Amino acid sequence: MARLAAFDMDGTLLMPEHHLGRETIATLARLRERDITLTFATGRHVLEMRHILGTLSLDAYLITGNGTRIHSLEGDVLHRQDLDPQVADTVMHHAWDTRASMHVFNDNGWFTGQEIPALLQAHVYSGFRYQVIDIKSIPAHQVTKICFCGDHDDLIRLRIQLNEALEERAHLCFSAVDCLEVLPLGCNKGSALAVLSNHLGLSLADCMAFGDAMNDREMLGSVGRGLIMGNAMPQLIAALPHLSVIGHCGNQAVSHFLTHWLDNPHLPYSPE
């Protein structure tokens, strides 16, 4: 039986309206009763995740910023990784040929250059929001990650530009169809989960993980049991064809799967 369960948030544990369903919360509590350690592995900021965690009355480790930070149950930093300052400087100051908006993250919060109210819908239940500033004024040595939000085809063209400019100095991934992230080299949820597992005296074989986007690929591919959401990006399913696909986040599929796993661990699972 798995001893550590890792959950992506948006498109996985959260429902389409970006909140946790009652069945999901109850199932997470059941995992803790079985002494299974929980970790939420997300692109969201730790400041937001602490607020969300505080509403659940659950102990969980936090992997935030797509692996740039790991926090203990007590809120202590177990691991941190920032963008190379030269990479951050290049990304923030270059005039990219794109219509996508740029968003910069550091330990103090989420920063962008203009008001984009539509982006706040994903954070309506936590109240977390961006701060509008001149992005070029942000110190390059304090940046954890940078992301671009916009049309997918536009982001694909932008990824080509970023790859040419940054070469092998950063990790690029799609955390959603409309979000392209620039992360520290070698930084992803999978590498962070390996650090956390080692800290807990576990191996990745002792872990199960759930996800729906390309920023979950390394995590899902490295654990003992990786589960892909039915609403996942097609690229993720294609990249990990050997993994099982469960139901849709709107149907609380993670809870559905885990309830079966807890109650009938030796029987085959069907998402129906």
Curated annotation (Swiss-Prot):
- What keywords are assigned to this protein? Hydrolase, Magnesium, Metal-binding
The positions annotated for binding Mg(2+) are: D8, D10, D212
- Residues at the catalytic site: D8
Q: Which GO terms describe its molecular function?
A: 4-amino-5-hydroxymethyl-2-methylpyrimidine diphosphatase activity; magnesium ion binding; phosphatase activity
Catalyses which reaction(s) = 4-amino-2-methyl-5-(diphosphooxymethyl)pyrimidine + H2O = 4-amino-2-methyl-5-(phosphooxymethyl)pyrimidine + phosphate + H(+)
Q: Which cofactors are required for activity? A: Mg(2+)
Which SUPFAM superfamilies does its entry note?
HAD-like
List the Pfam families.
Hydrolase_3 (PF08282)
User: What's its EC?
Assistant: 3.6.1.-
Name the source's superkingdom.
Bacteria
What protein family does this chain belong to? Belongs to the HAD-like hydrolase superfamily. Cof family.
Q: What's its job?
A: Catalyzes the hydrolysis of 4-amino-2-methyl-5-hydroxymethylpyrimidine pyrophosphate (HMP-PP) to 4-amino-2-methyl-5-hydroxymethylpyrimidine phosphate (HMP-P).
Annotated protein name in UniProt? HMP-PP phosphatase
Source organism: Salmonella agona (strain SL483)
Q: Lineage of this protein's species?
A: Bacteria, Pseudomonadati, Pseudomonadota, Gammaproteobacteria, Enterobacterales
Gene that encodes the chain: cof
